[in-house]
């Protein structure tokens, strides 16, 4: 009797899919396209169930320092040895999803956003070891981990984390933001849109604009929020939607996969 490959229904974690032998539609060509079609800030908008979150998980696994390179064996990107040697496992990565910022008030939404930053900061606690960071740096890091930050600190939190990671690793930082538009959509539904736009715009501007610690960033979402709303003044900002041919094979499924 033929052995069937398991389908990863509802699984959006690249490492789990590869380790547990689930069927994986190879989208690692996205890595090559991102690096060849360089943009410092890259926004991808696609409908739900188009593999955005899985692609972000895959990008994190590829670039992050300490990655298990065997996860990519046999996949398209592994054929590009020069690219893999230069980029695989070579960068600190900040990876957050804003999917959970779903609240009925601005105060609750802000608290949820703070929690997301706290949890991501905890993932990088290794930077507290050794003496690469001074006492001031470590105090800044602890404020992120403990959530001891007002709104003025929150809007600089991701930029602060990139600076700390760059100082520790002596490498520029890759930033991945999944479901970037959820806080804005929920704010619009619940009557605090203007406040949320200001918070998200300040957060994004600080981490994505004139940030010397940033290597590049990728954002994904379902909605194309007007650039004037939250991406004001960003240079080298690229957007790609379902209507664009570029990257059309790296999101969703084609007929040969169905």
Q: Where is each model-derived feature located?
A:
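Walker A/P-loop-proximal flanking segment of P-loop NTPase domains
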Residues: 1-80
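Conserved P-loop NTPase mechanochemical-coupling segment
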Residues: 10-14, 18, 101, 108, ...
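P-loop NTPase motor core
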Residues: 61-126
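Substrate-engagement module of ASCE P-loop NTPases
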Residues: 160-166, 195-215
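Conserved P-loop NTPase "ATPase switch" module shared by AAA+ and STAND
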Residues: 169-193
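Structural recognition of the conserved hydrophobic beta-strand(s) that form the central parallel beta-sheet
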Residues: 176-178, 215-222
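Short regulatory helix/loop adjacent to the ATP-binding pocket of P-loop NTPases
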Residues: 212, 225-243
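Conserved small/polar residues in nucleotide/adenosyl-binding loops
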Residues: 256-258
């Amino acid at each position: 009797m033929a052995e069937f490959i398991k389908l990863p229904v509802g699984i959006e974690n690249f490492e789990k899919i590869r380790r547990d032998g689930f069927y994986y539609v190879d989208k690692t060509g996205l890595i090559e396209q991102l690096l060849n079609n360089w943009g410092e800030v890259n926004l991808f908008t696609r409908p739900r169930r188009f593999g955005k979150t899985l692609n972000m998980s895959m990008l994190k696994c590829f670039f992050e320092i300490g990655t298990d390179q065997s996860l990519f064996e046999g996949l398209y990107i592994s054929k590009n040895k020069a690219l893999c040697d230069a980029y695989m496992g070579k960068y600190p990565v900040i990876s957050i999803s804003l999917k959970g910022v779903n609240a009925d008030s601005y105060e609750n939404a802000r608290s949820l956003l703070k929690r997301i930053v706290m949890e991501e900061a905890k993932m990088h606690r290794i930077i507290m070891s050794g003496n690469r960071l001074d006492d001031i740096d470590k105090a800044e890091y602890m404020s992120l981990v403990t959530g001891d930050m007002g709104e003025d600190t929150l809007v600089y939190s991701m930029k602060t984390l990139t600076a700390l990671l760059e100082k520790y690793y002596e490498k520029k930082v890759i930033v991945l933001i999944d479901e970037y538009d959820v806080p804005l959509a929920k704010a619009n539904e619940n009557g605090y849109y203007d406040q949320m736009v200001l918070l998200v715009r300040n957060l994004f501007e600080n981490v994505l604009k004139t940030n010397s610690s940033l290597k590049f960033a990728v954002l994904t979402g379902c909605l194309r929020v007007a650039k004037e709303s939250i991406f004001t003044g960003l240079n080298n900002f690229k957007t790609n939607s379902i209507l664009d041919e570029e990257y059309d094979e790296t999101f969703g499924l084609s007929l040969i996969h169905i």
